[in-house]
């Protein structure tokens, strides 16, 4: 399903889904968070068709999530790397929340070892809500409020 028409939606969730809702987009971002940056790395790790990967990378660049940086190995032609932008790095808590939900609600016997950890300690981290003063808010105490409510 194409979600291009959502880009003009007043809802920020719908606008975000116009980018992240495209098949492969979130997995490409996950791979970029793991340090992959070359077309061949994305293709190999994801098993995605070249034409689809090319389209998704272009969409993520156009959305400001990835940036293209050219590089050249000695004796080789110029190639492109795809690096996360600030907007791309801002998706870390979004992907962490998706992963946290998946571990909890879609657990499998041989589940993935992907997890988010604190860089300095290696300790697992969890996503949650906090008030402006830093105190925790239970998820069941949080409501989504529509405009004008």
Please place each PLM-identified region on the residue numbering.
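C-terminal regulatory/oligomerization modules of transcriptional regulators
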Residues: 96-149
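Basic, amphipathic "hinge/linker" alpha-helix immediately C-terminal to the N-terminal HTH DNA-binding motif
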Residues: 21, 73-95
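Long, low-complexity, charged/polar intrinsically disordered regions in eukaryotic proteins
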Residues: 1-8
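Short, hydrophobic-biased segments on the C-terminal half of alpha helices
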Residues: 57-58
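N-terminal helix-turn-helix DNA-binding core of bacterial DNA-binding proteins
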Residues: 11-52
């Amino acid at each position: 399903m194409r979600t291009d028409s959502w880009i003009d939606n007043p809802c920020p969730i719908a606008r975000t889904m116009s980018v992240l809702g495209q098949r492969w987009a979130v997995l490409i971002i996950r791979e970029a968070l793991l340090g992959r940056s070359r077309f061949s790395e994305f293709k190999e790790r994801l098993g995605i068709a070249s034409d689809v990967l090319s389209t998704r990378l272009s969409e993520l660049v156009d959305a400001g999530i990835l940036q293209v940086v050219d590089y050249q190995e000695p004796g080789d032609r110029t190639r492109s790397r795809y690096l996360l932008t600030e907007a791309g790095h801002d998706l870390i808590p979004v992907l962490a929340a998706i992963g946290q939900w998946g571990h909890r609600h879609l657990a499998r016997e041989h589940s993935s070892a992907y997890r988010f950890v604190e860089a300095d300690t290696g300790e697992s981290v969890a996503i949650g809500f906090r008030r402006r003063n830093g105190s925790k808010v239970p998820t069941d105490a949080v409501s989504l409020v529509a405009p004008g409510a």
